[in-house]
Amino acid sequence: LADYEHTRALLLVGSHPRHDAPLLGNRIRRAWKHGAEIHAVNPLAFDHHFSLNNQLIGDPAQQIADLAAVAAALAQLRSVTFSAEINEWAARSTQQTQAQAIARSLHQQEPSRVLFGDHAVRHPSASLLRRIARFIAEASGSAFDEMPHGANGAAAWRVGCVPQRGPGGSATAIGSNALDAVRKSRRAYVLYGAEAPEDFADGAAAAAALGQADFVLAFAAFAHPTLETSANVILPIGLAPEVDGSYVNVDGTLQAIAAGAKMPGDARAGWRVLRALGAALGLGGFEFDDFATLHANVRPLLGGGTLDATAEQPSPVPIAGGEGLLVQRYLPIYRVDGVVRRAPALQSTVLGESGELRLHPEDALALGIGQAGDVAVGGVRFACVASPEVPRGVCRVASGFASTAALPVTGARIQIERVKNG
């Protein structure tokens, strides 16, 4: 993290450090104050607290093309070859001049870095974007960094809480990801601190899958309408500030936390509930009675293996053609989990949102709503505002709201109609 202060050139790929990782954002701002050249390939024109030398924003397909154009420019500078697939994407970019400027900056400035951010991880073709970003880093001699997805994402990868790897990077049979698990309905689900539809990429599919399941077990800290109608058993657990625990930060450093509040009612620390359930089922690995023993058992798993993802399989490119606006999902900073969603003080700030749709001003004008108005998508009414952060041809849809859950995921197209009042 400290190395960012000394960076001379930085490419942000799907990253808004000011919101995604404020401490990292502060380091980048310091580097900018000392003359660092900062560039971005992003889905939206984010409100950064530093200036950008070059900014390429576009719909999900354009993001791939623009990043590929940077890769193509670097390949030409370094006289190296790269895949025909990336070359084909590069030819689709309409921002060739800026892409070449970014390539020259990364090539000439030392040290340089490529930061693969949270919005890139959420892209429908994240693995393709990652492959291109890694090529850019390798061709330019830049460091490559990827932001962990979620507050404890790095620890989850280390201990194997992902479908494609075991503890410490050990090989394992590839299981279903969360999207497949809800789109291809299962007979039973176990939810741990997750709320549907708000916490899922395809919230509508998640809520429907839970409603159709034969059995749903939920570990939850809050009452929720979906759980009340779909869960067969709800086990109350404490929130993170109410229990002892630990996190692994972006530098891989283990950070322990102590409980700072008392759990209400019958709630118990989640690890205690899991231990009791594991013991009742006769499973191995649950022979611990306190957090210190649990922590000692898990800690060795955090230091082994590698998080290298260069061998990953490319994902398809599910970006819809046809008419209508392309959806760009966006998770507002105060909609990321059940705690902040239930905090009135946070929701009343300037960063609090109400689930309105956002369009580029020219698209809003063409629709006839001016700066703000009501629109309909599939017969459902939404507030809509014009915003210069949104690229042309894109509809920014806020995630984390039950009201927007029925709208499609990033890369799909929607038809929007103006609602005439009165």
Model-flagged regions — what are they?
Residues A72-Q96, A151-A173, K262:
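Acidic/glycine-enriched edge-of-secondary-structure segments
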Residues H107-A181, Q328:
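A glycine-rich, hydrophobic/aromatic-adjacent loop/helix-cap motif
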Residues H6-L12, R18-D47, L115, R130, ...:
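A cross-kingdom feature strongest in bacterial/archaeal respiratory oxidoreductases
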Residues Y4, W32-G117:
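Long, well-ordered, tryptophan-enriched scaffold segments
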Residues L23, A61-A65, T94-T97, A101, ...:
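Conserved active-site and cofactor/substrate-binding residues in soluble primary-metabolism enzymes
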Residues P43, F50-S83, A126-L129, F135, ...:
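Short alpha-helices
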Residues L1-G25, R29, Q55-D59, A65, ...:
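Iron-sulfur-cluster electron-transfer modules
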